[in-house]
């Protein structure tokens, strides 16, 4: 990306370190930089901006308002498009703060351990640039709930597909269906901006069924063209409270002459615990019908091990947060390694999300992960563009 177009803020109480960060940004080509001497100063500067900056680098250990409270305010007031957590503190604490920020709905590019270097900054900032092309010109607040529900009803919300490839041979073996709102004006809205609203309105299950229906339609078309793939679809927590969901999903899949065995339903950790007894019953029926079941974002909830013991999962997805920088952060590597080892002992297929660099690929391949998904392989694309995206894919030469 053109770094000169990026606006970045540095929030750091130590003047010398703040100047180093600003100098490193200049070396990267960032021409628009803001600075704050502490949390309160940063919030004052941010509130006076005509538009939120692209990225805010926030030090955690500051006097007065610390970085944790500052990030919370930035998220609640939507004062930035993304943040990067900067600190010399325990990596486990950095991960906790990132999880908090995401819970607020704030995009987190990652964490950077001090001392800052140009390479460290570039590694996280490029993650913002990578996703700019997917965001297009969407406006985060430029739609109403009625407009969203109308869009769901008239087919504007469609699946885009991200390839999944085997580490062993580099072969594309599946895709994940990811919702996108293709608006009449040509803009594309990411799911993080509208899925929470659908969940609040009790319509998220309708989105799941649409992704499943359209995904199977494409799966059938690709199969006719000689591309045999599996389809992964995220399941709304609402579905797990509905005893009839398993029958509906089976009917949708089979209406396209697709076997349930070619479909993997991704379940987040928290969704099962909403109504454990009913949820376990629905999952058991789905598995009985042949659907694969994936525990999504493994390790980010509070009941991972209990879930694995109770639910007949066939797949474990390692969360992108653990994958990012696992090659350079021993704690993250340990989490990934332990997750993969546990999955092997339970005879589960393993999928690593957020594989974005050759270093990510190399580490996960060494640790024995089954399948990779991420921007290194390909970004989510409309169904019509998937064959070309697969044709462009080349397995990294290690």
Model-predicted segments: where are they?
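Two-component/phosphorelay signaling modules centered on CheY-like receiver
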Residues: 6-7, 15-34
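Helix N-cap/capping motif at the beta->alpha junctions
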Residues: 12-13, 35-44, 67
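Active-site residues of response regulator receiver
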Residues: 57-59, 319
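The short loop immediately C-terminal to the conserved phospho-acceptor aspartate in CheY-like receiver
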Residues: 60-64
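Alpha4 helix (beta4-alpha4-beta5 surface) of REC/receiver domains from two-component response regulators
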Residues: 69-76, 89-110
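EAL-family c-di-GMP phosphodiesterase catalytic domain
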Residues: 111-122, 237-239, 266-274, 291-398
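Active-site core of bacterial EAL-family cyclic-dinucleotide phosphodiesterase domains
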Residues: 137-197, 295, 373, 378-382
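Catalytic core of bacterial c-di-GMP phosphodiesterases, primarily the EAL and HD-GYP domains
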Residues: 203-278, 354
């Amino acid at each position: 990306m053109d770094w000169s177009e990026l606006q970045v803020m540095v929030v750091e109480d130590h003047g010398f370190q703040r100047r180093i960060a600003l100098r490193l940004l200049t070396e990267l080509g960032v021409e628009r930089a803001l600075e704050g001497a502490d949390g309160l100063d940063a919030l004052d500067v941010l509130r006076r901006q005509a538009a939120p900056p692209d990225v805010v680098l926030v030090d955690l250990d500051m006097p007065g308002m610390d970085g944790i409270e500052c990030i919370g305010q930035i998220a609640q007031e939507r004062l930035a498009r993304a943040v990067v957590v900067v600190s010399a503190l325990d990596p486990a604490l950095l991960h906790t703060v990132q999880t908090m920020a995401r819970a607020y709905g704030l995009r987190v590019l990652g964490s950077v351990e001090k001392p800052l270097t140009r390479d460290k900054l570039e590694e996280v900032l490029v993650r913002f640039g990578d996703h700019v092309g997917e965001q297009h010109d969407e406006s985060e607040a430029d739609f109403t709930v009625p407009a969203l529900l109308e869009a769901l009803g008239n087919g504007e919300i469609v699946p885009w597909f991200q390839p999944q490839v085997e580490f062993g041979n580099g072969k594309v073996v599946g895709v994940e269906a990811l919702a996108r709102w293709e608006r009449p004006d040509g803009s594309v809205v990411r799911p993080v901006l509208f899925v929470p609203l659908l969940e609040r309105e009790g319509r998220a299950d309708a989105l799941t069924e649409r992704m499943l229906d359209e995904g199977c339609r494409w799966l059938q078309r690709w199969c006719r063209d000689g591309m045999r793939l599996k389809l992964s679809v995220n399941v709304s927590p609402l579905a797990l409270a509905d005893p009839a969901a398993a029958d509906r999903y089976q009917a949708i899949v089979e209406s396209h002459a697709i076997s349930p065995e070619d479909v993997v339903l991704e379940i987040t950790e928290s969704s099962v615990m909403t109504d454990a007894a009913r949820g376990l019953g629905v999952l058991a029926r789905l598995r009985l019908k042949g659907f694969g079941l994936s525990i999504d974002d493994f390790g980010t909830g509070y009941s991972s091990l209990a879930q694995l013991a109770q639910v007949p999962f066939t797949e474990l997805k390692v969360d992108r947060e653990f994958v990012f920088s696992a090659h350079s952060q021993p704690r993250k590597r340990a989490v990934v390694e332990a997750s993969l080892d546990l999955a092997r002992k339970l005879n589960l297929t393993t999928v690593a999300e957020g594989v974005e660099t050759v270093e990510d690929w190399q580490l996960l391949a060494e640790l024995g992960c089954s399948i990779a998904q991420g921007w290194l392989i390909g970004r989510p694309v409309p169904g019509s563009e998937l064959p070309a995206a697969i044709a462009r894919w080349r397995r990294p030469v290690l």
